[in-house]
Regions:
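Short, surface-exposed beta-strand/loop patches at domain edges
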Residues: 564-635, 727-739
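Noncatalytic modules at the cell exterior or secretory-pathway interfaces
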Residues: 497, 550-568, 711-723
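Beta1/beta-strand and adjacent pyrophosphate-binding region of the FAD-binding site
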Residues: 14-26
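Flavin (FAD/FMN)-binding glycine-rich loop and adjacent Rossmann-like elements that form
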Residues: 55, 125, 147-158, 162-494, ...
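Conserved N-terminal/central alpha/beta ligand/cofactor-binding core
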Residues: 7-15, 35, 41-42, 47-137, ...
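N-terminal Rossmann-fold NAD(P) dinucleotide-binding loop
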Residues: 29
Length: 739
């Protein structure tokens, strides 16, 4: 009898009221919840798994990719999403550097990010299985909490579906699409002639470690003998290669994909089992075929229990982003976040498809995504963020990666704050409050391409102990000119002359070089050849030579110098990059359907040495910390010191009441994944607040991009006195943001 009474009590529904309910605790949902909570919105974050992070969690183990894709191929170069996802990625590395498995430390870092917020209540193992609507609004979401057997009901004026599959919005009747649009609908030339149900498929990742002795492996009975599968003969081609991670280990293959021709929601279990059979079978082939001797001491420690899902439902918002917007960078007045991953559309049948595993359809650098893609066209209080936002399948190939999705989540959480502030709907935020939304997003370090902040400082004067010259003169090693290399130079007026360092180890030779120009300030994308020239290099030459481009920069504010291959010639390079002045490997190519660049570029980790730029161009002055951009956009937009000893950056201004001061450091936005601590981050410094009294705030052990300080009094100036970073030669600061 007592047991029956307990059972009845357990089945009673518990009711909870919040300002904002976020369903889905992946990175998108986390960022939506954190953004809202930090502005005082009482938020419930609901996830159906025992851990946070979604595809980035320990259960799935997918890397957090974004606009700076593959760290070397994005033409925007310094393209990594900032804001909350930058904070989370740096936190993950800092607490997870000795846990490449994405295991316990990884999960703990994500827990920390959410549990630090007093306005978030976290509900894990909680599945939303019921949605109640009143008219065109969701009034409540009913959930069952697994294991506890509790029945929970969440009521709120605002909801966000960040589930990936769009399960809550679908239950509410929100309009959505699933599959591929035909060409006629949006005139996307990458779309098929007719619509279909095809989506991108799923992938299961795994983890290995290297042991001191050989590790035997026996294929489980359920796994495939992959040598008997139809795709086996094609392995090693069509992007299906056995790639290793930077640690030299096999950690999973993105191209082990299945399910795009099925229903990735309804057929989830079938898809997952097929992938398991393939993964265990592939590891058997790697270990026991004799063709991978380097794997002898590798041990398979984990096959992720969940498949990483790329695509399923896509909701319909007030705007549907499409391929033409991505390629043409449609200038949306309601820009809410950036994207920049290629339009990555995978083969219909995944690993079983005879075509390439994917086409990385070119995107011309970062672009803005509108706020209207983040709320429902027909459910008036429903936001969404993640891979289920309002876009075509082709555009979704670019927006679906996790760092980009998380930036969308931050926009949603900030939009929810404005909805609560004004008692309005998401659509009303678009119609009436976009300038305020964008101002808040910029303040919180969200990147909106081409937008800059105004700190409203009167009579501001910036000075510094020193500023780096516009040069890269540390000749550390030689790089043979066996390929075509490009030096990208942001300049304010023109380049009449400069010096580069080279060595000729053969007979007298000719250095052939070009000057190119581009149009997009957010990119390093030369579009046209301005002039071509030749310079004679004597036999045995070893040192600096002068070049005379005599050109103005293009619309993007840059001059590109391309050095063509030459036998016997080598360029001197520096291992340390100068922010904003990258070096590229360049290959000329014909325009094609999938890649409209005339020149294909890969960012080089070795940087061409140059000096004596004329006319002199001071790119790294103290005044850059008030530029309002806080990342390269046309110009590098940061202060760089000349050396590290005794440096100080000072800003004085007319007396002003200051709420907060934000310092923005250089975490090297050119790297998509954070796999090492950026040497350029200022670790130790003192912040000096100047007014009626001077206050010195010591900071030690910083590793992040943005440091925030509450002030709450009148100031006449601030100063930053850096004392150490993580090994960089100079100190670098993007912004000193004074509010």
């Amino acid at each position: 009898m007592k047991k029956a009474e307990k059972r009845i009590a357990r089945d009673e529904t518990e009711y909870f009221d919040y300002d904002f309910v976020v369903i889905g605790a992946g990175l998108s949902g986390m960022c939506a919840a954190i953004a809202a909570a930090r502005r005082g919105v009482k938020t419930a974050l609901i996830g159906d798994r025992p851990v946070l992070g979604g595809n980035a969690s320990s259960e799935v183990g997918i890397d957090i990719d974004g606009a700076a894709y593959n760290s070397r191929w994005s033409v925007s170069v310094y393209a990594r999403e900032t804001g909350l996802i930058e904070e989370i990625k740096n936190r993950l590395y800092h607490f997870n550097r000795h846990d490449p498995e994405k295991g316990a430390a990884h999960d703990a870092a994500l827990f920390d990010a959410v549990l630090a917020e007093k306005n978030i209540d976290l509900y894990l193992n909680t599945y939303a299985d019921e949605v109640t609507c009143e008219g065109d609004r969701i009034s409540s979401v009913g959930c069952v909490q697994l294991a506890s057997e509790r029945r929970l009901c969440f009521r709120a004026p605002l909801f966000a579906d960040c589930t990936g599959d769009g399960s809550v919005g679908a239950k509410a009747g929100a309009k959505f699409r699933m599959g591929t649009e035909g060409y006629d609908e949006y005139k996307e030339n990458l779309a098929p002639a007719r619509p279909s149900s095809v989506t991108n498929g799923d992938t299961i990742m795994f983890h290995t470690v290297r042991m001191d002795t050989p590790q035997p492996y026996e294929r489980p009975a359920f796994a495939y003998d992959v040598t008997k599968l139809s795709f086996f003969k094609g392995l090693g081609t069509n992007n299906r290669i056995f790639s290793k991670y930077t640690d030299g280990l096999y950690q999973g293959f993105w191209w082990v994909e299945f399910g795009g021709h099925l229903d990735t929601i309804r057929d989830n279990d079938e898809i997952t089992w097929e992938l398991r059979k393939i993964v265990y079978g592939l590891w058997d082939y790697i270990k026991n075929s004799g063709k991978f001797p380097e794997a002898a001491n590798m041990k398979l420690t984990k096959v992720r229990p969940l498949a990483g899902k790329r695509e399923s439902r896509r909701f319909i918002g007030d705007y549907v982003l499409n391929q033409n917007d991505v390629e043409n960078k449609t200038p949306f007045a309601d820009a809410a976040y950036i994207a920049g991953w290629p339009m990555d559309v995978h083969a219909d049948y995944g690993v079983y498809d005879s075509r390439p595993a994917t086409y990385w359809n070119f995107v011309p650098g970062m672009y803005n995504v509108p706020f209207r893609t983040l709320y429902s066209v027909n459910v008036e209080n429903l936001f969404f963020a993640g891979r289920n936002t309002s876009c075509t399948r082709i555009a979704n190939g670019s927006t679906r990666v996790m760092a980009t999705c998380a930036a969308g989540g931050q926009a949603v959480g900030t939009g929810a704050y404005l909805c609560r502030k004004y008692g309005c709907t998401p659509r009303a935020v678009y119609r009436e409050h976009i300038p305020e939304l964008q101002k808040l997003l910029l303040r919180d370090d969200q990147t909106l391409m081409g937008y800059k902040e105004d700190y409203a400082l009167e009579n501001a004067v910036c000075t510094a102990t020193s500023c780096k010259r516009t040069e890269n003169a540390d000749r550390e090693e030689l790089m043979p000119l066996d390929k075509s290399y490009v030096l990208a130079l942001p300049v304010k007026e023109r380049v009449d002359s400069l010096c580069i360092a080279l060595k000729n180890e053969g007979d007298a030779a000719v250095l052939r070089w070009r000057v190119l120009e581009g149009d997009l300030p957010e990119c390093y994308l030369p579009e046209r050849i301005v002039r071509e020239a030749e310079t004679e290099i004597p036999a045995g030459a070893d040192g600096w030579i002068s070049l005379f481009p005599n050109v103005r920069p293009g619309k993007d504010g840059k001059v590109y110098l391309q050095f063509l291959p030459a036998d016997g010639l080598s360029l001197y390079v520096s291992k340390e990059s100068v922010t904003g002045i990258p070096t590229f490997i360049c290959e000329e190519q014909e325009p094609s359907l999938r890649d409209r660049r005339r020149f294909a570029f890969t960012l080089s980790y070795k940087n061409i040495c140059f000096s004596e730029l004329q006319p002199a161009c001071a790119l790294f002055g103290a005044e850059n910390v008030l530029s309002g951009y806080n990342r390269p956009y046309g110009m590098p937009n940061l202060w760089i010191s000349d050396g590290k000893w005794g440096q100080e950056l000072k800003i004085s201004f007319s007396e002003k009441y200051v709420e907060e001061v934000h310092l923005v450091f250089n975490t090297e936005l050119e790297n998509d994944l954070i796999s090492s601590q950026s040497a350029k981050v200022i670790r130790d410094y003192d912040l000096v607040l100047k007014g009626e009294r001077e206050e010195v705030i010591p900071v030690r052990g910083n590793y992040g991009r943005v440091n925030r300080f509450a002030v709450g009094r009148k100031l006449t100036g601030v100063a930053v006195r850096p004392s150490e970073n993580y090994g960089g030669k100079n100190f670098e600061i993007y912004g000193v943001k004074i509010y």
